[in-house]
From Swiss-Prot:
GO MF assignments: lipid transporter activity; nutrient reservoir activity
Keywords linked to the UniProt accession: Disulfide bond, Glycoprotein, Secreted, Signal, Storage protein
UniProt name for this protein: Vitellogenin-1
Disulphide connectivity of cysteines: C172-C211, C1435-C1596
Keyword Secreted found: yes
Biased composition (Polar residues): 322-334
């Protein structure tokens, strides 16, 4: 209290402070504001203002003042420093009113400025910037009480204290520092004014982080933005310092000079050269002081302007809004900054930044209405005409109409303009201006613009087009208009879009796309705006349109999330206040209940597409209230499919963005329920990981992987924790540290391959100022290798400004259900007979029940920077798609269609804007604009034949993509309608033609295809040329805001590129491609390079981190007509013991049947029981023809594959051959025994050999390669010492050789570690290159690691290579030698010790478990790896069978079994301990048995003859023997069985995932449910489970009958999931009712 009393006392003595009544003060004004790319160049653009300020002191609390003789001069030149003296300035008169104004004081501190009502707003703010220099508080009037304050007095003229002080830049905390001026300081205008006092320095430093009043405009800022508006630090930062010299004492003084300098920076976090700045200063210097001799006349029209803070203009009126005088607290009422400053709040309390006394403040702009454009302050088009909207200058609807016509014309002629290598036609800049113009329009003006689009006067160029093109031009015109209006984002734009939908102008997919942009572009979505949008989405005109009704719901929910869940983040609340009042309960009372009711109705109707849409919409709200809607479905009290519940869990991601603790709590409880569906648990883990979970939770999840048996969930946890532990960004280090601690608790044996996984990728492109984090989350399937769900999230930032994230995802209930629907299509079952299949009879005997069908549900979601699309799918969708496809195919077969063409046009737009007043009174503005223009021209036609197997399809068109990233910093001078800019534009444009014609002619004997690329007859629909343009253009500019229609392709003195050096060009050509590169970084010497050197220089220029330096790249590529013919054939090959060679080609012409037959015969040589394929293709480019022929053969019995290849280039007109190449090669593996002990004695070996010949008739050059990939004793010795082999030998004592330990042991002892390869060649070039390579390696390696070898054994032109892997040392020894050079080194010598390459990991990965089923001596192993004891007895047991499923559309009907999956494998045990196998493949039966010491096979009762060199071949399978084993291999059914009489190894493809039953389990990747029996429930005892698959109806001896009776009496567990209570009463938003009796109370 003593401190406050002291301030009150000293304030009473300070009557005049800086102003002595009756005096007149004359100050000189100097002001400058400049913008620059300060880290790239010192090329400035800006303005200098000078003038005079006269002040007459009327009374202690009133000053009369006038600003006069003001002049300004533009600056656009290079300076050493921004505050240097600038020569050669040309000043023009700055037309200010010259009217006097009053300054109101309280205790010497300025409280208000009264200015004539007729003075324009821009002049008021300039006056305030000048008067702000006189705000000096030496008596603590605005002091912020603090124990750190040092109060100055006359005896101690030193002071340090903080005050809450207003200036034109805002009312913010200011740190005062007062010190005496040194005696030798000579820059004081009138040093004698100090009289008996002193000269003082007063320094004021403004803290923009703590402000009570900030004037600003912002839009497009994401909720992830890591800086606060107008702060002193961060990506966009500002600082301000005032230096004031006063004379006298702290109570009575004269202000001699006052200088305020301010700096605003945009600092890139990625590359300094992308940084930019705005510097400004305002200086007042005392020129003279005297008694008042000519009193100023006072205006009778003075009104308060509030205080010194910048005031907003009314863009659409020349009348200023009346302001109330500032009611500031004096020192008696001073508040502590620690307790009161609202700007010192928590970041989480974002919605409370406005005054505690009320949501709205008097100085804010009026709330926008729906019919009128918002009164957006500070923006060029709203203040650019003397402080008012540019609408005052001309008819902007006519300008906008001309822009639309120009853009449409540019798009229509874009293929022609593609040839222009001069400064390219500017497509994007007119779009940017058009959108910003529409933002200034009201509803009537947008309607007027719409009407003008039909006026021919605006389409003088377009009207000259032929009728066909005119129709396309008109469509393009309207497409641009629709997209531009929605991109404007204002209330009038919303009303206009609504009207267009209501009257049918916008409909179907185009309307859906347009409406999805509304939440992305909305600028001022007030309660009225949101409610009008709600009326639109519930209107029948929307709800009845298929695509629109989905898009509208999601767009609305997204908008509501931005306006209510993130109230102060996205929109200009510093200009208008909160868009939606805190008292607005429409979200809770109307919007969410409406969606919830619609979801209930959709579930009652069983309409999956509607259900999915409303789940997505509810999730998009991101509000806790949604939990109460999802609660009964997630907890199982109301019915919903697993897929629908999965969508609800995924939707928690939106909730986690604003309520991370709440979302984490619910998700963690879902994850912890091990009886829940694995898909939901995986999705819940992903949600938890997004919320920065506490360490104890991460540790719990990691530790639980040691108990949890769900492989998908464990894989998700492991991959996510690993990804988080590797995060490097500073903001994520806390999370990364926790993940690294938790990682130590993970189960070390988690298998992630083929299971659900999470990935995180980081990419930084400093040269483009872009950074990107990509998160890919996958939920695997149990019935296919294709993931069931995949979520791709892309987070991009530009130098530190985060762009709205993009998301792409798909979700599907079951790919198997989709396949089942495909198999039920008429063309898949049209040849079926009514005869009951053998497999069906077997299934009936077992009594296998069909599973309850999984209804097919799915969706595709794409959410980009610009728009979003959601496509829900169900059975009906697939049927509709298939029926549409059938209609198209049918129409192709019945008739032909002439070629027609259509255009698809998209204009996408995103911008981020930050604007606030500078201390010089001029509006600062930073914009990041990312527009994209996409044009797709596509046309097609078709022909068909009813009598022949002939079809032809033609398509042609082009794609044009133009994207710009425009970063601009600068300020606006309303009085001269100029926007001073320092900017960097990154432009990308691609125009490429698309043209092809396909004809297909297929018969049983021959299959031929003809493909023509860029067919010349359709060249007019494309161009035949492709162009690419990329540029980074830094520049400074002095843009005339009113000159809207200037020629963008021409440079003038108002726009100057920033060149650090004189730019030079590089030209180079590649065939029909021409390229030009131009840059500051290309010097005169580099510009002379050609060919490969020029290409290297260009690649270096654009691929390395080059920052914002000027560079440009243009490419022109010509694509002529290319005709491609192709054919293929297949044959079973006769055995021929001779060696295959490159033959003398019988016919070298394209499409030769003779050559194909020759190749099939040749490629089958030296192979037994081989199958062969041949593929032939010719490519006719007009000037030459290239011929390719490839033949391939394989033999299962030989474990050998062989290929023969031929290529030539020949003349189009005659058979002259220009070039020719032939190659042949094979790879052969050695068969290894199933028995590990026998395999130990064998040496695994892969033998390979290849020969290549070049030149006409192959007589020029030859290359021969042969080698082996084998095992050394090192691997054998290592294996024998391993625990795996020891465990295997224990299993083998019981007669088991195929249990998991022995499978791994077999792999371990068969690992190959030695590669030996030799190359013989006649090519001197290749041989010389090899020698140079060896010498280069020698130069890389220290002499200590190089060993010289004896090379006497190497012959001329032979290259030998040997690689010996050293897994124990995690290394490899490599030897290279020729007759001229040799080197031996280790792999680590080259790649270093820090490389990710690991020999240990490579060998370890080879031991991963495979999905095989085993019947061993005493145990069995399921496909999913479950091991259990098994005794079959002499009774057939089903190892594996496919089984029918119920039709999801008709539960009484059973789906047919796909023809390529009709397979059963059965086994029984004989009295001698051997086993027999019975296989049913389609309608054939295969029997395998052991007879004495021999293995026998029969097919349909007939003995199958085979040997080690010949297989028994059937249409769909073959039988062969090797290493005392019979193998049945069926590529048709994708089944392989290996049998040695006592042990059975069964392998099937992923096509059988979750589609089988039997002793081998259900093959769903989860071992814990493998004991599923025919009744579709799960037993716990192995013997009972096995007995349920015994064919007890037939002759059956052994334990099976008795065990089957026990199984019928045992408890069989249901396979259904068991949801739990995961949402508490409190989380659901209601008072607690559950668990009231819990605990002792």
């Amino acid at each position: 209290m003593w401190y406050l009393a002291f301030l009150l006392i000293i304030g009473a003595y300070a009557a005049d402070h800086a102003w002595e009544t009756g005096n007149e003060y004359h100050y000189l004004i100097e002001s400058r504001t400049l913008t620059v790319l300060d880290k790239l160049s010192q090329q400035f653009s800006g303005i200098v203002i000078k003038g005079g300020l006269t002040i007459q002191v009327k009374s202690p609390d009133t000053l009369q003042a006038v600003v006069s003789k003001t002049q300004y001069a533009p600056v656009h030149k290079t300076l050493e420093n921004w505050n240097d003296e600038i020569a050669d300035l040309k000043f023009d008169e700055l037309s200010m009113s010259g009217k006097s104004f009053e300054i109101k004081l309280k205790h010497g501190v300025i409280r208000d400025v009264l200015i004539d009502q007729d003075v324009l707003t821009w002049e008021v703010n300039l006056i305030k910037s000048i008067v702000s220099q006189l705000q000096v508080d030496l008596q603590g009037e605005n002091v912020i009480a603090s124990s750190d304050n040092q109060i100055p007095d006359d005896s101690q003229p030193f002071g340090v204290y903080k005050a809450m002080e207003d200036s034109v830049g805002g009312k913010c905390e200011v740190l005062y520092s007062i010190t005496p001026v040194p005696e030798n300081f000579d820059s004081i205008p009138f040093p004698n004014l100090r009289k008996d006092g002193l000269n003082f320095f007063v320094t004021k430093t403004k803290n923009y982080n703590k402000c009570e009043q900030q004037m600003a405009y912002h839009s497009g800022i994401t909720d992830k933005m890591n800086w606060k508006l107008g702060s002193n630090d961060g990506v966009l930062s500002r600082s301000s310092t005032s230096s004031i010299i006063i004379s006298g004492n702290v109570k009575h003084f004269t202000i001699q000079s006052s200088l305020t300098t301010s700096e605003i920076f945009v600092r890139s976090k990625l590359h300094d050269t992308y940084s930019s700045a705005v510097y400004d200063s305002v200086k007042l210097t005392l020129d003279r002081m005297n008694q008042i001799s000519n009193p100023m006349s006072a205006s009778n029209n003075l009104v308060s302007t509030g205080n010194l803070v910048y005031i907003y203009n009314n863009p659409f009126s020349n009348q200023r809004k009346l302001r109330q005088p500032s009611v500031s607290l004096n020192s008696m009422e001073a508040r502590s900054s620690e307790n009161s400053n609202e700007e010192n709040r928590s970041d989480d309390d974002r919605s409370n930044f406005l005054s505690n006394s009320g949501e709205e403040r008097e100085y804010l702009q009026s709330k926008p209405t729906l019919n009128e454009a918002p009164e957006s302050p500070l923006l060029p088009y709203f203040i650019g005409y003397k402080g008012e909207s540019i609408q005052k200058s001309e008819d902007i609807t006519s300008v906008a109409a001309r822009f639309i016509a120009q853009i449409a014309w540019n798009l229509e002629t874009s293929p022609v303009n593609a040839f222009n290598f001069s400064p390219s036609t500017e497509y994007i800049e007119p779009c940017i201006i058009l959108i910003r113009l529409i933002r200034t329009m009201n509803v009537e003006q947008i309607a007027e613009l719409e009407n003008k689009l039909s006026d021919p006067i605006y389409h003088l160029q377009g009207n000259k087009l032929p009728t066909e093109y005119k129709k396309s031009y008109d469509k393009t015109t309207w497409d641009i208009f629709f997209n531009a209006v929605v991109s404007a984002g204002t209330g009038p734009a919303l009303i206009s879009i609504k009207n267009m939908i209501k009257n049918g102008q916008l409909k179907d997919t185009q309307a859906a796309m347009i409406i999805s942009k509304i939440p992305k572009t909305a600028l001022t979505p007030t309660s009225e705006y949101v409610n009008k949008f709600f009326e639109l989405i519930t209107d029948e005109q929307v709800t009845k349109q298929r695509f629109l009704n989905t898009s509208a719901l999601l767009a609305f929910a997204e908008l509501v999330r931005y306006t209510q869940s993130n109230r102060s983040i996205h929109y200009p609340v510093h200009s208008f206040g909160h868009m939606v009042s805190k008292q607005d309960n429409a979200l809770l009372e109307t919007y969410i209940p409406y969606m919830a009711n619609q979801l209930t109705e959709a579930i009652k109707d069983g309409d999956s597409r509607r259900i999915q849409t409303y789940i997505m919409a509810l999730g998009n709200f991101g509000h806790p209230k949604v939990l109460s809607v999802f609660e009964p479905y997630l907890e199982g009290t109301l019915p919903a499919s697993t897929f629908q519940r999965l969508m609800m869990v995924v939707s928690l991601n939106r909730l986690s963005e604003n309520f991370p603790r709440l979302a984490r709590s619910v998700a963690f409880k879902i994850y912890m329920n091990i009886m829940e569906a694995y898909e939901l648990r995986c999705a819940a883990v992903y949600v938890v990981m997004k919320t920065n979970p506490p360490l104890v939770m991460l540790q719990r999840m990691a530790e639980f992987t040691n108990q949890d048996q769900d492989r998908h969930v464990n894989s998700v946890i492991k991959t996510n924790i690993d990804a988080l532990a590797n995060l490097e960004q500073p903001e994520f280090q806390d999370l990364a540290a926790k993940a690294r601690i938790a990682r130590e608790l993970l189960n070390p044996h988690i298998d992630t391959e083929s299971y659900s996984q999470g990935f995180l990728f980081k990419k930084i492109i400093p040269s483009l100022n872009m950074a990107e984090i990509t998160i890919l989350q996958i939920i695997g399937s149990q019935d296919t290798t294709v993931p069931k769900s995949s979520y791709l999230n892309i987070y991009q930032s530009y130098g530190g400004f985060n762009l709205p994230p993009s998301r792409m995802s798909y979700e599907i209930s079951s790919f198997r259900a989709l396949l089942d629907m495909w198999y039920e299509m008429p063309w898949m079952i049209e040849n079926e007979t009514q005869k009951k299949l053998i497999i069906e009879e077997t299934i009936e005997k077992l009594g296998i029940k069909g599973e309850d069908p999984v209804q097919f549900e799915g969706n595709i979601f794409v959410n980009t920077l610009y728009s979003s699309q959601f496509s829900p799918l169900d059975n009906n969708t697939i049927e509709e798609t298939i029926n549409a496809f059938k209609r198209i195919i049918s129409s192709w077969q019945r008739s032909s269609k002439n070629f027609t063409s259509e255009n698809i046009n998209y204009l996408h737009y995103y911008d981020m804007t930050v604007a606030f007043p500078t201390e010089s009174g001029l509006p600062f503005i930073y914009t990041l604009t990312v527009p994209k223009l996409l044009r797709i021209n596509i046309g097609g036609g078709h022909k068909g034949s009813k009598t022949e197997h002939f079809k032809e399809l033609t398509a042609a068109g082009y794609i044009m993509v133009h994207e710009k990233v425009q970063s601009r910093i600068g300020f606006v001078t309303p009085f001269e309608h100029r926007h001073y800019v320092a900017g960097i534009d990154t432009n990308t444009r691609l125009v490429t033609p698309l043209g092809l014609s396909i004809s297909v002619n297929t018969t049983e004997e021959n299959k031929k295809f003809k493909l023509t690329l860029q067919p010349s007859k359709y060249i007019r629909y494309g161009t035949g040329h492709s162009t690419v343009h990329f540029s980074v253009v830094p520049y400074t500019a002095r843009n005339n805001i009113l000159d809207l229609e200037h020629d963008f392709s021409k440079q003038d003195n108002d726009t100057l590129p920033v060149h650090t050096k004189e730019p030079h060009e590089i030209h180079f050509y590649i065939s029909n491609w021409m390229f030009v590169a131009k840059s500051d970084l290309i010097d005169s010497k580099a510009s002379e390079k050609q060919g490969m050197e020029a290409i290297k220089e260009t690649v270096n220029l654009f691929c390395n981190s080059r920052g914002a330096y000027y560079r440009r790249f243009d490419g022109l590529m010509y694509f002529g007509e290319v005709r491609i013919r192709a054919s293929y054939d297949f044959a079973k090959l006769d055995s021929d013991s001779s060696e295959a060679t490159i033959p003398t080609i019988v016919n070298k012409e394209p499409d030769s049947e003779e050559r194909k037959k020759q190749f099939l015969k040749e490629v089958g040589k030296n192979m037994n029981s081989a199958y062969g394929y041949v593929f032939d293709m010719s490519i006719d480019q007009g000037f030459d023809v290239q011929v390719f022929t490839l033949a391939y053969s394989y033999s299962q019995i030989d474990h050998k594959s062989q290929a023969l290849f031929y290529w030539n280039v020949q003349s189009v007109d005659d058979p002259k051959i220009y070039a020719e190449l032939g190659a042949i090669g094979y790879v052969k593996s050695k068969s290894i025994s199933l028995n590990p002990e026998k395999a130990l004695e064998q040496i695994p070996n892969d033998e390979f050999k290849a020969e290549i010949r070049l030149g006409n008739n192959f007589n020029e050059e030859m290359i021969k390669l042969e080698g082996n990939w084998t095992r050394t004793d090192d691997v054998k010795d290592m294996a024998m010492k391993s625990e795996i082999v020891k465990k295997c030998r224990q299993d083998m004592k019981q007669g088991n050789i195929l249990l998991p330990a022995c499978q791994k042991a077999n792999k371990l002892i068969n690992q190959k570690d030695l590669l030996m390869m030799s190359i013989d060649t006649t090519s001197d070039i290749l041989y010389a290159s090899a020698n140079r390579g060896i010498l280069w390696i020698q130069s890389l390696i220290s002499e200590n690691y190089v060993e010289t070898m004896n090379l006497r054994s190497s012959s001329k032109n032979t290259i030998d290579m040997e690689i010996k892997m050293l897994p124990d040392n995690d290394d490899a020894k490599i030897s290279l030698r020729t007759s001229q050079a040799d080197v031996s080194f280790s792999l680590k010598d080259i790649i270093g010790n820090d490389s990710n390459v690991s020999m240990k990991d490579t060998f370890k990965e080879q031991l991963d478990d495979e999905s095989v089923c085993v019947l061993d001596k005493t145990h069995a192993v399921t496909f999913d790896g479950k091991v259990y004891p098994l005794k079959l007895g002499k009774c057939w047991h089903v190892m594996m069978t496919i089984y029918p499923k119920r039709d999801p559309n008709n539960f009484e009907k059973t789906l047919s079994i796909p023809s390529d999956m009709r397979a059963i494998v059965m086994a029984q045990e004989m009295d001698d301990g051997s086993k027999q196998i019975k296989m049913i493949l389609g309608d054939q039966e295969v029997h395998l048995q052991k007879s004495g010491d021999c293995l026998e096979a029969s097919v349909d009762g007939e003995t199958a003859n085979f040997s080690d060199h010949k297989s028994h071949q059937e249409k769909d399978f073959e039988i062969y023997g090797s290493n005392e084993t019979i193998t049945v291999f069926s590529p048709t059914y994708e089944i392989t069985v290996e049998y040695d009489g006592e042990h059975i190894l069964l392998m099937i493809s992923d096509n059988y995932l979750n589609a089988v039953r039997g002793l081998c389990g259900n093959y769903d990747t989860q071992p814990n449910n493998d004991f599923i029996i025919p009744e579709n429930c799960i037993l716990t005892k192995a013997e009972e489970f096995a007995a349920t698959y015994a064919m007890t109806q037939e002759s059956c001896q052994g334990p099976a009958p008795e065990n089957k009776r026990k199984a019928e009496q045992s408890t069989c567990m249901s396979r259904s999931y068991r949801p739990s209570d995961v949402i508490s009463d409190r989380e659901a938003g209601r008072s607690s009712t559950k668990n009231r009796g819990w605990g002792y109370h």
